[in-house]
Amino acid sequence: PAPAPVAPPLLLRWQGALAKAPAGPLSSRFSLLAGLMLCALMAGLPLVTRSGLTLLIAASGLLWLLLALRTPPGEVGAINRWVLGIMALAVLATGFSPVPTAALHGLFKLLSYLGVYALMRQLLATAPIWWDRIVASLPAGSLVTSVVGIRQLFADTGELARWADPNSVADGTIRIYGTLDNPNLLAGFLLPAIPLALVALLRWRGLARQAFAAAALLLGSAALVLT
C-alpha cells in the first residue's frame, strides 16, 4: 500500500486554505504580478522614496499572503527553517523587550522583509524565468543612479559632499551621491550591485544584454570610486 501522506507542519497548515475557492481573474496572473512587483522593488531601491519603498514591500508581502492562501504548503527547506528560527527569536525578543513599542516596530519591519523573501522564493520556485529579470533590475537601478551621480560632477559642485578628514590626502575631495543624497548610502548600494553586474556580464548571452551588464559594471565602479 502507498504510504499515507505526511501532514504539513502546524505552522504551515493555513497555507492553501483558499485552494478550492473559485479562481478570480488575477489568479492566473499571480506570477506576472509578483515578478513585476519584485522587479520594481529591486530597480527602485535607489530611486523611490522611503514611503514608496514601504508601499512596494507591503504590497509584496500581501501578494505572497494571497499566493500562499491559494497554494498548498510544501516541504520546509533547510534555509526556511533558519528563517523561521530567526523569526521566532525576533518574536521572543519583542515579547521581553523593555521598549515594546520600538521592538514591535522593528518586528513588523523584519516581517515585511521576510514577506519579500517569501514572495521571491515562491516565484522563483514556480517560474524560474524571472531569475534573470529580477537580477537585471538591480543593475538597472544602479545604472540610473550611477549616471545621475557622475553627471553631478559636471554641474554645480557647490552642494556636493566633500571628504572631511584633515589627516587624509583626500581631504576636500568631492563625493557624489546620485539619487540617495548621501555618498555612503550610494556606496553601500553599489557594493552588492556591482558583483551582480559582473556575474550577469559573464553569464548572459547576447550583445544587448552583455552591453547593458558592462555599462552597469563600468559606470557603477566609477561611481563607487567617486563616492
For the regions a language model picked out, list residue spans one by one.
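Transmembrane signal-anchor hairpin modules in multi-pass inner-membrane enzymes, especially those
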Residues: P1-H105, G115-P139, A200-F212
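Alpha-helical transmembrane segments of multi-pass inner-membrane proteins
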Residues: M37-M42, A58-W64, V91-L92, G115, ...
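Membrane-embedded glycan-lipid processing machinery
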Residues: P100-F108, I176-P183
